[in-house]
């Protein structure tokens, strides 16, 4: 038995002297060995790197960095723990081949070479902050451009070379005519699109694709193209809602942006109509209506009281959202007048106010409140869901004669037409 007093190895074979390897675990799932090496570079002389994988899945679970000496390993452990936002676990361990490592360390003529590490795979998106001595040893390279931007550039260059065949871009000329019953409309989007002839729909979609693929396209040009057909605009919005690209809050925000000055306009109209219903009206665009038609329709008298309300009062818009299968309002809110909600509606109120001035002596009510001047009957069940003042206003709008509607500007005719589509059955 060896005399314990002669066993001197216990004085230098300590865990502190044998721990020459750093084990880095708890790696982010998207990190690999190259990324970890790019971060550890500059922490000290590394002579070997080994990956530690899960034996069942083969997934990387850790990386082992073997340093030249245990002192280098301890210094590297202290430096790496000073890295901010470093989402890993760092441990000092004794390598399995510690005897060979000690033998090579003691041999001054050892051929073990120190690895030259770099930061080619440095994770810029992780937001790490390296200590100064690590950056001095191995500088951080300039951040490369994001790959997404490069992909977008390639896609734009590729899209510029796309050429649609004339059979699609000019479908109405080349494809055969549509046969009734060959296309069905099982859902709301298809029902809206079925209002457009199929050849014209193919042509619209092709032109929209061509327009969107242009490199210098502007948002206003796409908006102008979509404004040419309200059914296309509504169908696109419904499709975006179903696919999850937008939600109801986006639709509500867009509708509210179209009625920006509604509260002030509504309060001013209510105040002026309650105090001086006729004298305070100002009109710079006269409305030319034949006197005989005006006198025959006394229902025009109170139109100036609440005409701006349906397009400017927010409570009027969410009601169709509860009734439509996809939560969309009728075409009116999606096709704002060309003059904007802050100009077109006061003009309409003023012009209808002149009709009131011409018929201020008429006080008789309509002969049939549920019957519109044009063909059709007012949908009273739907109309009763609105406040009482809005019910009266919409009834009066629906009783306008075709001649009076034709005398209005085109944008105001569109407003009246939207009411008729919504409340006449």
Swiss-Prot record:
InterPro entries recorded: CSTF2_hinge (IPR025742), CSTF_C (IPR026896), CSTF_C_sf (IPR038192), Nucleotide-bd_a/b_plait_sf (IPR012677), RBD_domain_sf (IPR035979), RRM_dom (IPR000504)
Principal location class: nucleus
SUPFAM superfamilies to which the protein is assigned, alphabetical: RNA-binding domain, RBD (SSF54928)
Keywords of the record: mRNA processing, Nucleus, Phosphoprotein
Transmembrane segments: none
CDD domains the UniProt entry points to: RRM_SF
One GO process term, biological-process aspect: mRNA processing
Modified residues (Phosphoserine): 272
One GO MF term attached to the UniProt entry: mRNA binding
Pfam families xref list: CSTF2_hinge, CSTF_C
Function: Component of the cleavage and polyadenylation factor (CPF) complex, which plays a key role in polyadenylation-dependent pre-mRNA 3'-end formation and cooperates with cleavage factors including the CFIA complex and NAB4/CFIB. Component of the APT complex, which may be involved in polyadenylation-independent transcript 3'-end formation. PTI1 is required for 3'-end formation of snoRNAs.
Self-association and partners: Component of the cleavage and polyadenylation factor (CPF) complex, which is composed of PTI1, SYC1, SSU72, GLC7, MPE1, REF2, PFS2, PTA1, YSH1/BRR5, SWD2, CFT2/YDH1, YTH1, CFT1/YHH1, FIP1 and PAP1. Component of the APT complex, which is a subcomplex of CPF, and is composed of PTI1, SYC1, SSU72, GLC7, REF2, PTA1 and SWD2.
Leftover remarks: Present with 937 molecules/cell in log phase SD medium.
Protein name as annotated: Protein PTI1
Gene that encodes the chain: PTI1
